[in-house]
Amino acid sequence: MYGIEYTTFLIYLISIILFNYILKSITRMMDYIIYKFLLIITITSIFDSAQNYGINLPITGSMDVSYVNATKDEPFLTSTLCLYYPTEARTEINDNEWTSTLSQLFLTKGWPTGSVYFKEYDDIPTFSVDPQLYCDYNIVLMRYNSSLKLDMSELANLILNEWLCNPMDITLYYYQQTDEANKWIAMGQSCTIKVCPLNTQTLGIGCQTTNTGTFEEVATAEKLVITDVVDGVNHKLDVTTASRTIRNCKKLGPRENVAVIQIGGADILDITSDPTTTPQTERMMRINWKKWWQVFYTIVDYVNQIVQTMSKRSRSLDSAAFYYRV
């Protein structure tokens, strides 16, 4: 009887010792695997952080900020509309209650009070540096100015399309545009952008890479620049203003919750001729210039027709994302 008890005790003791040994072996093996993995990651990160001169960086970031998407299409009663207008409109109207008046008029078209937001901007160059379009539907009013035709056209191209962007370090790298949808977009204070195309030996074509004075000037004293160069050719860039931010961007397609309305002007802005605009229609319209009250009355009358050319999207445009997001 006592022999059986001793045997049982020894079996339990041996089992515990064996189990403890197995656990220690597994622990040592896991430690080895983890340390090995961390060592590989550390070595790899060192190589990844090294400078890599003369490469064409891939585009992986985005200037679009995603917010919660609706699970179903909602009627205008549950949508928001932002109306962007220049300061001169408020100055000319000179009525502290003018937005309240327009809100009541929008109500007659099915837009509840509080669903329409009036957003003021100083001028086209200022707005182009910091466009923020957050509503379900966004209508931008641009008063035609012959001296700002380029800024207006590039602003329309920027806000009417979605872009995938990466920051550019022009002090270390040279860049090339891979196709027609690939552009370099710069925002900031007034500056000049110059480029020097390179041959396969990375020597300048018609310019000297060490002398920016020989570079070809593609933009002069602008706040918003969408630069297009010859595809498949490496370029060295020079930006004269340090505060300007330039990004390597690719046009993804139309931003369908934005419309641009040109106010007045003998010339009509048109960006549909751009081969990257597909289909060849854009949400750009024109209203004859009269008085700002007349302009707003016209927009109220046709707001639902305008919105029907648009579609509610799950992305908003925030220039802060353009500057900082990788």
UniProtKB/Swiss-Prot annotation:
- Pfam families recorded: VP7
Taxonomically, which superkingdom? Answer: Viruses
**Does the UniProt entry include the keyword Plastid?**
no
Signal peptide start-end = 1-50
Modification(s) after translation: N-glycosylated.
The set of disulfide-linked cysteines is: 82-135, 165-249, 196-207
Q: Which GO terms describe its cellular component?
A: host cell endoplasmic reticulum lumen; T=13 icosahedral viral capsid; viral outer capsid
Question: Which parts of the sequence bind Ca(2+) 2?
Answer: 177, 228-229, 231, 301
Where, subcellularly, is it found? Virion; Host endoplasmic reticulum lumen
Q: Name one GO molecular function term.
A: metal ion binding
Q: Which UniProt keywords apply?
A: Calcium, Capsid protein, Disulfide bond, Glycoprotein, Host endoplasmic reticulum, Host-virus interaction, Metal-binding, Outer capsid protein, Signal, T=13 icosahedral capsid protein, Virion
- The residues that hold Ca(2+) 1 are 95, 206, 214, 216
What segment(s) does the record annotate as region LVD motif? 237-239
The entry annotates sugar attachment on: 69, 145
* Protein's UniProt keywords contain Glycoprotein: yes
Q: Where is this region: CNP motif?
A: 165-167
- The annotated region (GPR motif) lies at 253-255
Further information: Some rotavirus strains are neuraminidase-sensitive and require sialic acid to attach to the cell surface. Some rotavirus strains are integrin-dependent. Some rotavirus strains depend on ganglioside for their entry into the host cell. Hsp70 also seems to be involved in the entry of some strains. In group A rotaviruses, VP7 defines the G serotype.
**Into which family does the record put it?**
Belongs to the rotavirus VP7 family.
Describe its partners and assembly state.
Homotrimer; disulfide-linked. 2 Ca(2+) ions bound at each subunit interface in the trimer hold the trimer together. Interacts with the intermediate capsid protein VP6. Interacts with the outer capsid protein VP5*.
Q: What does this protein do?
A: Calcium-binding protein that interacts with rotavirus cell receptors once the initial attachment by VP4 has been achieved. Rotavirus attachment and entry into the host cell probably involves multiple sequential contacts between the outer capsid proteins VP4 and VP7, and the cell receptors. Following entry into the host cell, low intracellular or intravesicular Ca(2+) concentration probably causes the calcium-stabilized VP7 trimers to dissociate from the virion. This step is probably necessary for the membrane-disrupting entry step and the release of VP4, which is locked onto the virion by VP7.
Q: What is this protein called?
A: Outer capsid glycoprotein VP7
